[in-house]
């Protein structure tokens, strides 16, 4: 019940003692009353306490070496990229944790968002996920190819923020300290260096739209997603402390680097380096190369940290299969152990799995599907075969030339 009178009896707020005549509205409960001013004050107190809890979580920011140790437990290789990410993430959250206590005369620390460049399956998304998990902050993934600028059919960039808010269980204060990973950022590059007269819906316009939220702004987000509508209730979120990590394969950027370095890449026999040596070119990438690829200067300027990831080779993929805490081989061994069965992979089988992933150009992300293909029939039959004690995966089984070897009691 809400109003200024209850049975024509003058009522007072149970919290501040003001009468119905001194406030705009009094809400009645079970023998208790609260005025609109106390409701507003309560909301402000709750908001401040939630913000303090979020900041308290960030006061002990893991040091770069500690972050690197975590990444090393889950991610194989990519040492330079992991070091760059560890430093960038530490500096970002150190900046966030000290922002609230800084004096007006202190140096204004600008946000350093991150650009990850590397081939498909090199671990870009997994690195971002692992960092967010280790910091216990909300994390959201978005695909740049699904975004369009305002006025076109597609997804508004604000919907990226909604995913983060949802990951934070609609706690906006927590979301404002989260991490957003935008994948396939190279797919919204301008087509060529010459700016078209008509805007490219999936290119420069989307970069401009992303630029606003990446550099820091108070954005209005539709709580149910989709396009904005007049008179629609919005969630307000400040993006100044959200860490944005964007990533893409940037296929062909090695050639841009070679041209800048003065190497001939056109004509038969002119490229003296092997394709495998492209990894060294990835470490030479500068903003000029990224701009030539098609990202606008303003957008590049908001991504000062560039982490280049290498193409994974057979040795790297075998290590990914076996070494990390959550390695795929360990996962499948655990699955079969629940049925009382031991699982073993021959060394040649691991090499065959890695070779298949390279041939398919899927990198680490393709390893699971190859194992699934190899073990599908086994995982179907094993629960019904109580006499089986061990399964051995061979090279021939991976190549589809024979079935895995079964040992019985």
Swiss-Prot record:
Protein residues bound to ATP: 119-126
Keyword vocabulary terms for this entry: ATP-binding, Chaperone, Metal-binding, Nucleotide-binding, Zinc
Amino acids binding Zn(2+): 13, 16, 35, 38
InterPro entries named among the record's database cross-references: AAA+_ATPase, ATP-dep_Clp_protease_ClpX, ATPase_AAA_core, Clp_ATPase_C, Clp_protease_ATP-bd_su_ClpX, ClpX_bact, P-loop_NTPase, Znf_CppX_C4
Biological process (GO), any one: cell division
Pfam families cross-referenced by the UniProt entry: AAA_2 (PF07724), ClpB_D2-small (PF10431), zf-C4_ClpX (PF06689)
Cited function: ATP-dependent specificity component of the Clp protease. It directs the protease to specific substrates. Can perform chaperone functions in the absence of ClpP.
Quaternary state and interactors: Component of the ClpX-ClpP complex. Forms a hexameric ring that, in the presence of ATP, binds to fourteen ClpP subunits assembled into a disk-like structure with a central cavity, resembling the structure of eukaryotic proteasomes.
Identification of the protein by name: ATP-dependent Clp protease ATP-binding subunit ClpX
Species per Swiss-Prot/TrEMBL record: Streptococcus pyogenes serotype M5 (strain Manfredo)
Gene: clpX
